[in-house]
């Protein structure tokens, strides 16, 4: 059957380029206005280290393999993609900005808010870095603080606290270059913690306070939400890969054997049932099989996972929102699948913890395709892609001159490739 070009308004494609895997997920809205996942493709990732492209050719090859799989399985041809981006080069800071308005008789409007936010994109950063997201936390009008939406109010001085996110220009451009060399068009770049949040969290969690912990292969992303606003983000430079390497070194086995052991028999906490349980590893080139104690395996995994969760908990505490996380912690990503990790996190943080699966907002018939937390980012990219299209339609109907001029100023910058719909809230 001839392949159909899917570059149309009905279908969204998400591309997740991770340290251990590249995955592509295709979705569309069904007749009930629910997102239906049509298919997915994945390939081993060999050109990415801790979220940063380290080898262009290898990364392109991995993307092409994922493309080939999803196109064959679904008999389609993909073109435009919403691309996830993460990595230890992503940084965040808190900043306060202000503007003084000329006429108090004219009520505060979107133009004033956009002007205030636009000033944040001009912040002086470290050479090679650029501001990619500006997320308002709360506004102050003539000294009156705690305002969530100042539109329609009267006032001269408009201030706001912002959560500002920066990225290395080179790292972002390398991601885009890989996507383009693989024959795809990067429609938008989306920070992966934001995508995972949309796929796994519900409205109550986003509103009442939650910490999303996305454990990938190379890094662990932390994103804190309260009142449906992103309050804090951080990147921990460790993920599931380092656990596998610890097992390899500690047990003197091959890396692929270590990964299989982690998946099949690994645990983040020791339990009595592990006593005297042994696993046999086949020997190489005629060597004798190696006996591995499951208890030893759990001790290795537990030590590293405790280190990662301690770093996560430190970020939660320094954010200032520890006491406000009424719904606790949600774990997702491939690294969250380690047995008993949920219990370890609850023990360390004394907070309710659950595993976040990427089926929170998709049609029931699609859930079997993306049951694993490893697909949270990919599903979230599809969901955010549809949200972006809806917001674009709304903006096209209500554009003002400032928005147009602002877009023109940013068009030559990396900012133009980043979605901006995180900057107000997550809904």
Which ranges hold each PLM region?
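Feature representing long, continuous alpha-helical segments
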Residues: 245, 299, 303-310, 314, ...
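Short glycine/serine/threonine-rich phosphate/pyrophosphate-binding segments
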Residues: 22, 197-198, 208, 217-223, ...
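Glycine-rich phosphate-binding loop of actin/hexokinase-like ATP-binding domains
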Residues: 208-250
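Glycine-rich phosphate-binding/hydrolytic loop that grips phosphoryl groups
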Residues: 356-402
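Flexible glycine/proline-rich, aromatic-decorated loop/lid segments
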Residues: 277, 352-355
């Amino acid at each position: 059957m001839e392949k159909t070009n899917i570059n149309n308004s009905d279908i969204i494609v998400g591309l997740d380029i991770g340290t251990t895997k590249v995955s592509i997920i295709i979705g569309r809205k069904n007749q009930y206005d629910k997102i239906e996942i049509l298919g997915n493709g994945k390939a081993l990732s060999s050109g990415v280290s801790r979220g940063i492209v380290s080898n262009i050719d290898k990364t392109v090859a991995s993307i092409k393999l994922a493309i080939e799989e999803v196109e064959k399985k679904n008999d389609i041809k993909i073109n435009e993609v919403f691309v996830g981006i993460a990595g230890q080069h992503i940084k965040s800071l808190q900043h306060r900005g202000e503007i003084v308005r000329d006429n108090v008789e004219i009520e505060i409007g979107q133009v004033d808010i956009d002007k205030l936010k636009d000033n944040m994109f001009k912040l002086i950063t470290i050479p090679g870095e650029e501001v990619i997201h500006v997320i308002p936390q709360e506004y102050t009008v003539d000294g009156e603080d705690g305002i969530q939406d100042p539109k329609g109010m009267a006032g001269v001085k408009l201030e706001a606290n912002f959560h500002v996110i920066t990225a290395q220009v080179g790292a972002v451009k390398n991601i885009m270059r890989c996507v383009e060399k693989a024959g795809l068009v990067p429609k938008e770049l989306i920070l992966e913690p934001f995508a995972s949040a949309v796929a796994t969290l519900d409205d109550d969690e986003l509103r009442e306070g939650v910490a999303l912990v996305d454990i990938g292969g190379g890094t662990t992303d932390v994103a804190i939400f309260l009142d449906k606003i992103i309050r804090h983000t951080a990147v921990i430079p460790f993920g599931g890969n380092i656990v596998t390497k610890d097992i390899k070194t500690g047990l003197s086995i091959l890396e692929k054997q270590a990964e299989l052991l982690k998946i099949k028999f690994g645990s983040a906490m020791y339990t009595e049932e592990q006593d005297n349980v042994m696993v046999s590893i086949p020997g190489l080139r005629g060597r004798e099989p190696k006996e591995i104690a499951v208890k030893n395996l759990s001790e290795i995994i537990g030590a590293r996972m405790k280190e990662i969760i301690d770093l996560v908990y430190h970020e939660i505490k320094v954010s200032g929102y520890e006491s406000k996380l009424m719904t606790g912690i949600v774990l997702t990503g491939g690294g969250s699948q380690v047995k008993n990790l949920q219990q370890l996190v609850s023990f360390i943080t004394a907070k309710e913890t659950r595993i976040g699966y990427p089926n929170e907002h998709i049609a029931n018939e699609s859930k079997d395709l993306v049951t694993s937390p490893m697909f949270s980012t990919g599903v979230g990219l599809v969901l955010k892609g549809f949200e972006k299209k809806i917001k674009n339609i709304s903006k096209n109907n209500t554009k003002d001159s400032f928005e147009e001029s602002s877009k023109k100023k940013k068009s030559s910058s990396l900012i133009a490739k980043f979605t901006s719909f995180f900057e107000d809230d997550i809904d």
